[in-house]
Amino acid sequence: MLSRKRSFAALTVLLLSGAAVYLHSQSSTQTTLRNPPPDADTALLVTLGRGDSEEIDWSGHIEVENGEVVELVGYEMRAGDLIHPPRRWEAKTRPAFAFARRPHDVGILEDLSPDAFLSPRFYVYLNANPATRVTLKTAQGDAEFRADEITVGSPGSFGGGRLTVERSAFPILVGRGGESPVSQPLTDNDSASVASTVDGDTWIAWTGFRNGADRVYAEKIRAGTRRGPDAIPHAVSPKDGDVFRTAIAEDAEGKVWVTWSERVDDNWDLFARGFDGQSWSRIERLTTGSQPDTQHKMAADSEGHLHLVWQGYRNNRAAIFYNSYNVNDGWSQPEQVSADAAPNCWEPSLTIDSNDNAYVGWDQYGPNGYDVHLRGRVNGEWRAAVAVAATARMEAYLTVAADAQDRIWLAWHESGVNWGKDWGYPFDITANATGLYNSRNVRVAVYENGRLRQPTQAFEAAMPGAGPGDNFYEYPQVAVDGQNRPWVFFRYRRPAQHNVYWRTPAHHALWEIQGSYYDGAKWSSPQLIPYSTGRNDMRFEVTRDAGGELVAAWPTDRRNFRDFVNMLPDVFAARLPSPEGLNPSPQLTELRLPPAEPARQPPNRPQREMAATEPVHPNEAQDVESIRDYVYEVNGKRYKIYRGDMHRHTEISWDGYNDGSTEDTYRYAIDAASLDFIAITEHNFGVMDEYDWWRSQKFVDIFRVGASFVPLFGYERSVPYPNGHRNVIFPYRGAPLLDVQHYEWNTGQDTFAYTRQGPERFFAYLRKYKAIAMPHTSGTNMGTDWADYDPEVEPVVEIYQSDRTSYECVDCWRAAPMDDRPKQFGGYRPDGFVSVAWEKGYRLGVQASSDHLGTHTAYSMLLAEENSRDSLVDAIRQRHTYGATDNIIVDFRLVANGREYMMGEEAEISAAPRFKIHVEGTDDLGEVEIVKNNQMVYAQTPGAKTADFEYRDNELPGEEASFYYLRVRQSDRDKQVAWSSPIWVTSR
């Protein structure tokens, strides 16, 4: 018998439940794909083998007296674990999985402790009453308890804590009622919102994707039920479209309003529609700006007035806006909440206090990076905004909630200093900067009577000790229940590999939602929300009903702990159980944010002392302004330099779980890097899922801001050496992905009695869809041997990648050393260097990009007439490109035939070639070199920030083209580099 921490009477009579309803009668390895049984009334989470340091069998079965077992559903179960209905399981604690150490992982990946073992977890669904007694009979002993003894904040602990039982919220699957045609696939559901009505019903709204389009849906869960309606959900947006996020609330007349953002006439605006119990009203358009209006939240006050906040771009800057609705006057005109002069403002949150005053929280990008702000609308007038946290750390995604005393509880997540600044491959870079997803933690504060305060116990202190891959608590959602108890719900990362360091691409992970409440003195242990596994940025929405109970809705993609991949996007809802009794008055103290610390340095890099306030680029704003002001006037046309990144992953990619969310990547591009464009290029294995590809393209449109920021549509087609990885860029939305054929994976051996299948099929696909491709990491195991080339569709190569290294040539600047395997990120294939392609006569321009992890240290520079998708893609086709690791201006031209030729162009001339060179660095230029046919033919050491000169080659051009390009290296600490695209010259 496993002993329990609390004593209780031993069972004298065991009556097995004989009336169980078995929804699934077959043994199954499925976990998160199995739906919760709607005819149960109690959910318990069982964890086996906590603290085990060896593989131990915990198989067993459940027995119930005065109640019934409805179903056992696996949760955290791995290969070999099984559920055998109706009441038996097979499960073991199993060794944690370690990522295999590759040569370049030396000094990065941590060794797993030999006693690192994973505990299986499963849910028990019961029909229970105060007399129900449960026995869990396991191979390690029995656990006996009364079902009502397991409450929130009071879990059952047995066998010295090796087996635990926790009360769980009862999950309700949303949007799957009614009968849809057999020929129709299920919708991919996402972006949930929740409202509780005065009569106790719960309304959920969400977006649903199917057949290349999505809509807004809603449905009502009646009070007292644990299942959605047996009817097809309401289609709030009446036709297929392109929608983003939802918000829902009830007005004074009992009408339920849904708001959403939708792309109409190539712009995102907010729309609203109300349901009076019989029919839906006409759709009302709430915004008419020429730039995106998205990221909205809505709440109702005690009078049934609705309050709406959102992020809207005006004149290329994001601001926070507010409007309201009442049944007499309808929707008001928008008011700007953030200051006119404020920088980009993001992600508003909203709460209403007991006096119907609205408080709006948001984060904005300033000199310190992202900071969080709060502003109240008291008695109809806006008070001055309050800077809640404005340190050198990244502070973002603020949420707010009012308690019964009108204190405003605030929660946000943080990361390190200089977020999104210089972070990348070179082993000598030691900038005081933080990558996009190096860390996340949650901080909580309280705004009370004009003062900023904090709980006496920091939220972080209550979280479990983190392993290498588990130090991520993020996207908090704060709420206050009817007992005046503050809660913080958050996303928590669970990696597939348990030794992955934050400097290494993480291969597969999931995030689950957990919640913790403040009991007046301390934060509770985190409590899991069921069916909450999913991608990084799936948001949790919660409201309080008239009885004080918290009601929540959340999306999930139902990924599991075996595969860690998107499976079936769904939406769930639940009433959240709380501890009984009124919460004590919270113990608070003055808010004292800890001092900022220097950025964490990768463990395998040189370490140096630095101040937390040390800037990365003190003159960055001026450098960016200079590069944007620079004009190429060539043959009667004007070209400008548009800075971007043509190769970026997020957590949608299978190896992108240390890259952060899609939205964080756009934040980085717009704010931290001040880019003009970006192409997020998820692996085809990430976006081959139809919904992920749709969502990826949706974000490209959401974050297009006039001509100031223009994302591009693209993905990465990942085929190993010798065919190689290539990024694909489209000038438009909606092209399909191309699958990878089996024999494209042939690495050169005649394993299947076939020669390797080359990329000809891929080249045909690019022609068909008017796309272009760019090889990258060409000198690695992801690269190419340059056996195949199509100049029409493959005009440019990624010469440098800040996640890894340079691929210009062997022994060139920043190239991987040929005799140092730990510095050969991704392997070493010298036949894939760009110089080899040039030697073959391939006419490839160059650009630099990031891939994974690296930020602010690789720029794809496009010379275009305007910042539009067509113009940018045309610049790539013409090879009007160069690559740089900093904001370096490179102007490299050939003067001949009474005109000038830009980099990337071809010229037939009769005289010796003459080149004009102009370079402006961000620091002193150390070396400026001209390379002809892979040989350096000219060099100078300017020792100043500018170089302006001409170079004439005394050798006349021949029949076969010679190519010339410029490369630059600065003399600053990190020796920043730039490469022009070549100019090809032949005799006339």
Specify the residue positions occupied by each region the protein language model found:
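N-terminal Sec-pathway targeting helices
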Residues: 1-12
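Low-complexity, serine/threonine/proline/glycine-rich extracellular segments that form mucin-like
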Residues: 36-83
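Extracellular, repeat-based ectodomains that mediate carbohydrate processing or recognition
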Residues: 90-92, 100-119, 153-613
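Low-complexity, intrinsically disordered segments enriched in Ser/Thr together with acidic residues
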Residues: 104-145
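Beta-strand-rich extracellular modules
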Residues: 137-141, 555, 967-971
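Edge beta-strands of extracellular beta-sandwich domains
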Residues: 143-154, 974-984
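Extended, charged catalytic domains and RNA/DNA-binding interfaces, predominantly
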Residues: 526, 551, 567-988
